[in-house]
């Protein structure tokens, strides 16, 4: 297991597995192809290398990011569409070997985060002030509602260099 703090375009070496969680939505759409091409180049050619991308996305065509989210939470973040992601993966030389839409998961995650946040609100208020408390509570609440009632969801996308080399169809290999 290796962690590196650097621009993804500067990563060197080759890897059996690459996992990126909550990262892709911070890549500019003009670099989607570059992102997946870099993953392609970083995966080993041994036939069983896999990349798992876990990203917030929209079921609608690409559109603007919510102004509140852009200003206060994820400045410059993007919410990619399935069509943008698929096109970039195909152009990179990778093959999609698995795609899962986690529709009802993230709103529950946000609800759990909010519950824990509110249990510790007094400590957080001392450390960050009242404005932060209101902002963070609004963020967690509104995003939970957005994931429950709008077009937002989480995609979990598995990509490989060679589809025929996927280590199994049962996904048991993920847990080893």
Map each language-model feature to its residues.
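Flexible, glycine/threonine-enriched loop-and-boundary segments that flank and lead into catalytic domains
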Residues: 4, 14, 34, 138-145
């Amino acid at each position: 297991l290796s962690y590196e703090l650097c621009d993804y375009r500067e990563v060197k070496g080759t890897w059996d597995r690459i996992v990126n969680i909550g990262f892709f939505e911070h890549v500019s759409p003009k670099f989607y192809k570059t992102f997946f091409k870099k993953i392609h180049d970083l995966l080993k050619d041994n036939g069983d290398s896999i990349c798992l991308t876990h990203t917030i996305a929209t079921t609608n065509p690409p559109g603007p990011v919510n102004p509140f989210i852009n200003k206060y939470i994820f400045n410059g973040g993007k919410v990619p569409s399935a069509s943008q992601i698929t096109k970039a993966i195909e152009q990179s030389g990778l093959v999609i070997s698995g795609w899962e839409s986690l529709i009802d998961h993230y709103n529950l995650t946000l609800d759990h985060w909010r519950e824990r946040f509110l249990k510790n609100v007094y400590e957080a208020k001392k450390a960050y002030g009242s404005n932060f408390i209101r902002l963070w509570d609004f963020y967690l609440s509104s995003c939970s509602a957005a994931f429950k009632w709008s077009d937002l969801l989480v995609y979990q996308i598995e990509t490989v260099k060679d589809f025929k080399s996927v280590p199994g169809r049962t996904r048991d290999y993920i847990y080893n």
